Each structure stands twice: as C-alpha cells, then as structure tokens.
Amino acid sequence: MKVQQYRLDELTHLVKGELIGEGSLQFSNLASLENAEVNHLTFVNGEKHLDQAKVSRAGAYIVTAALKEHLPEKDNFIIVDNPYLAFAILTHVFDKKISSTGIESTAQIHPSAVISETAYIGHYVVIGENCVVGDNTVIQSHTKLDDNVEVGKDCFIDSHVTITGGSKLRDRVRIHSSTVIGGEGFGFAPYQGKWHRIAQLGSVLIGNDVRIGSNCSIDRGALDNTILEDGVIIDNLVQIAHNVHIGSNTAIAAKCGIAGSTKIGKNCILAGACGVAGHLSIADNVTLTGMSMVTKNISEAGTYSSGTGLFENNHWKKTIVRLRQLADVPLTQITKRLDHIQAQIESLESTFNLRK
C-alpha cells in the first residue's frame, strides 16, 4: 500500500505557522526526536529537548521562533507559538482513518433503528430497537447498542463496547474497547440484614467531543441521569457511578473512582488513582494530585493533595510509628506541651535581653 506523503508547505498552512526552508519536501509521518528519519516531521517542546533536537535526523522541526535560534545547523522549520498544539493538530493528518461506510453482513440491527447512510457498522455489531446512529459514525465489531440508544455524528465506538440504559451520545464522541456506558448503578436498600436492589431508572447523557478510554464503567442514574458535559476526557480503567455530573473539559486519569451523586466542576483535573466519595461537590478549576482521596466538598479552585509520598522503606516505618504514637496523645495535651515550651522560650529570651 502506498504511503501518503504531505508537503512541508501544506503542513505549515494547516497549523497557521511560518515556513522556513524547502516547502516542497515530502513527509510520510510524525516521529519522536530520537527516532525520526529524514522523511519525518518532529517537534521541540521546550529548551530541555534541544540537545536531542541537535542530533536528530528529522527532515523538519516544529518550533517556536526562540527555539529555532538554538538550532542553527538545521534547515527546515515550521515556526509556531505552541509546538505541542501544532503537533496535536498534525497527528490527525497522519492518522489512519476508517473510510468504509455501510453495514457488514454479520451485524444484527433492529428494523426500527435509524442508521445514517454514511455510518459504518462493523461485524457482529448488535443494535436494538429505536436506536439512532448519526452521519460518519464508526461502530467497530462486537459492539452492542441496547434499545433506545442514540449516537451522534462523527463518533467512533471501538470494538466490544456496550451502550445501554437508553444512553444518549452527542457528536464527535470517542469510546474505546470494552467500556460499558449506561450499566446498572450500584444501588441497594439495606433492610433486616439484606440488600434490596434498586432498579436504576435514569440514563447517561454524554456531550460533544467527549473521549472515554478502554475498560471504563459509566453507570446510569438511579432516577436522574449521569451526565458528562462537552469536552470531558477520561483515561482507561475509570469508574463513574450513578448520578455523577462531570463539568465540561474536565480530565480524569486512569484508575480514578467517583462515587454516586457527586458533582465535579468544569476544567478540573483528576490525576491517576484519585478516589472521590459520594454526594460531594467539587468546584470548577480544581486539580487533584495522584492518589488523592476526597471525602468533603471542595468549594474553591486550586490544587489539592492527600496521602504520603514515597520515601525509603525504613524511614517510612519509623514515620508510621511516630504517627501512631502521636495519635495516642490527646490533642489538648499536645497543645498544653507546646504552650509550655513557648512560655519557656519567651522566658529565656526575656532573661537574655535583660543581661544585655
């Protein structure tokens, strides 16, 4: 298969950059600084990468004007204000796109479902009653859309995904393999030593430009809907419980768990393995560092952390012993000791000043 080539001047135009060098050069792909060859385009995202750039074999470099001045031995550049953003834009040029349309013969589609003529439905896909699939949407093999599910335009649903509970996805949503959208929420009523299952009657609403990684679970609401607003991005292995509401452009890294009925604001970042208890509210523009545990509301923007960072094992053991010893001492006793020490210090300072 012939590899698609792109001219340097064409690529420069796509990122609204300034071309320096030979615009007719042809490029077959993007590559990292260390692995780039002469037919590859690469980028330099900061001064810390200049040493790698100086020895790179790449045919051209995406850089800022200031970074270019440090690479006098190189000839071909795309000058932009933000090299990383330009790189992100150009990845879509070189990405291998699925151009097929139509429905594969092994797919099982209910007669009432409405499937766009420009959509692609892969092998062994099952689509239930009253479903809708929009224009240019791709649904890969072995995926299941239960009854009353709606998928918008330009979406990509990877293989082995299950979308159920009447979930509604808007446009340009990407969902990766083995994720479940709209599964039954974890709702039970305790009575006389037993757990009584609560039927989950809500759904899941997913906005535009949402990306969800593989092996995630996003449960439908018990009564109200679970909601992901526009631009939310979610890594692999994330659990979002019933009735959770996530604000626009919030990013959630792998292994996070969000308990039911919690509301997370806009433009938040949850780093890896964060846990958020249920029925809480987190303000806009909050960042949680890795493995943070949230057990109360966060009402102000900022960066929050919890837990103890890594250090040498013997040191850690001694620290834990001291923490336990500290926990055994009543707080009032600690306060009295500190007050006594402070009084002694002030007395010594006073005596020292008198002797002067």
Curated annotation (Swiss-Prot):
EC number: 2.3.1.191
Active site: H242 (proton acceptor)
EC top class, as a word: transferase
UniProt KW keywords: Acyltransferase, Lipid A biosynthesis, Lipid biosynthesis, Lipid metabolism, Repeat, Transferase
Any one Gene Ontology cellular component term annotated for this protein: membrane
Catalytic activity: a UDP-3-O-[(3R)-3-hydroxyacyl]-alpha-D-glucosamine + a (3R)-hydroxyacyl-[ACP] = a UDP-2-N,3-O-bis[(3R)-3-hydroxyacyl]-alpha-D-glucosamine + holo-[ACP] + H(+)
Family listed: Belongs to the transferase hexapeptide repeat family. LpxD subfamily.
UniProt function note: Catalyzes the N-acylation of UDP-3-O-acylglucosamine using 3-hydroxyacyl-ACP as the acyl donor. Is involved in the biosynthesis of lipid A, a phosphorylated glycolipid that anchors the lipopolysaccharide to the outer membrane of the cell.
Protein name: UDP-3-O-acylglucosamine N-acyltransferase
Species of the source: Acinetobacter baumannii (strain AB0057)
